[in-house]
Amino acid sequence: MAFCAPPAYLTHQQKVLRLYKRALRHLESWCIHRDKYRYFACLMRARFEEHKNEKDMMRATQLLREAEEEFWQNQHPQPYIFPDSPGGTSFERYECYKVPEWCLDYWHPSEKAMYPDYFSKREQWKKLRMESWDREVKQLQEETSPDGIMTEALPPARREGDLPPLWWHIVTRPRERPT
């Protein structure tokens, strides 16, 4: 499950990178021959590199807006979408066949013996989750005000020195920005 931040919360660099990737994908739809695509991709990269070190944020924002308008005018009417990507013909087609994690608890010991490394690690993770779950829930309750959650900001992932919760990607955010 991928998290997609709303455009208002993206940094300028993230917006530029996403525009560049979208532009390359649409260019790929326009240029079906690989050599022609590569030539125009290099030209596009040069256009982006030209303003890479722009210090004036007003100018950089204006350039980004102009580039997005140019992209909007020149985008492909029927861009190629990969089948497993959102909007593709096979997107989430096989979700119904994915087996939940708890089903592995009911495997026969002879089946588990075929994957000893995986199941030994899995047992360690389950034990760790059972030991840390109550502590993590207590921590979240302590950090939440009595009036309830006042903002949409997610609680921190852990206190210093604690192990990361196993469900952090669902309910928490990292305490510090990763480097």
From Swiss-Prot:
Compartment list: Mitochondrion inner membrane
Gene expressing this chain: Ndufb9
Family assignment from sequence similarity: Belongs to the complex I LYR family.
Disulfide bond annotation, renumbered to this chain: none
Record's subunit section: Mammalian complex I is composed of 45 different subunits.
Species: Mus musculus (Mouse)
Sites bearing N-acetylalanine, chain numbering: 2
Alphabetical keyword list: Acetylation, Electron transport, Membrane, Mitochondrion, Mitochondrion inner membrane, Phosphoprotein, Respiratory chain, Transport
One GO process term, biological-process aspect: mitochondrial electron transport, NADH to ubiquinone
InterPro entries: Complex1_LYR_dom, Complex1_LYR_NDUFB9_LYRM3, NDUFB9
Protein name: NADH dehydrogenase [ubiquinone] 1 beta subcomplex subunit 9
Bilayer topology annotation: Peripheral membrane protein
Modified residues (Phosphoserine): 85
Chain's role: Accessory subunit of the mitochondrial membrane respiratory chain NADH dehydrogenase (Complex I), that is believed to be not involved in catalysis. Complex I functions in the transfer of electrons from NADH to the respiratory chain. The immediate electron acceptor for the enzyme is believed to be ubiquinone.
GO cellular component: mitochondrial inner membrane; mitochondrion; respiratory chain complex I
Taxonomy, superkingdom: Eukaryota
